[in-house]
Amino acid sequence: LDEMEAAGSRSGDDLDVLVVGAGVVGAGTALDAVSRGLSTALVEQRDFASGTSSRSSKLVHGGLRYLEMFDFALVKEALEERGLLLTRIAPHLVRPVPFLYPLTHHAWERPYVGAGLALYDAMAMVGKYDMGVPRHRHLTRRGALRLAPDLRPDALTGAIRYYDAQVDDARLVT
């Protein structure tokens, strides 16, 4: 409470927003509040990005798994935020990161996963901001094994390479 009182009394005025926790979400919330002209204080118990943010996967994903649940609004929002980070807010801290989806079922898997990733890419391209990452690509068994030689060739029919993004969140919050 002493820290919060000190943060609010520095200027002698009441705060519009007090954000507790200076991880990636808290810092982003404070930045958003300040950019809207609100008087804002950000307090952290330890160091910036030292809590949950320090133990995250660092992924900035577009919500691919939510396509299967037909939550298109959430996917659209996540893709727009990813594109905004990649192209406007922090292109120096956010970078595309490739993923390899191994295909093991002969008949249905490639068209099913491929259609989902095509929709994912299309939603990213028609969003408010640029996609920011390369489009997905279908690979043969040989192409997949070139990228990931430890995959079991006897179980593999091919793969699909797609992209999301990764952020240096400790630098993003400071």
Identify the role of each PLM range.
Residues 34-55:
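Glycine-rich FAD pyrophosphate-binding loop
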Residues 18-20, 41:
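Beta-strand elements within well-structured catalytic alpha/beta cores of enzymes
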Residues 125-135, 145-174:
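Helix-loop-beta segment of a Rossmann-like dinucleotide-binding subdomain
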Residues 58-147:
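Dinucleotide-binding Rossmann-like beta1-alpha1 core, especially the glycine-rich loop
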Residues 1-17, 32-36:
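Extreme N-terminal leader/targeting segments of oxidoreductases
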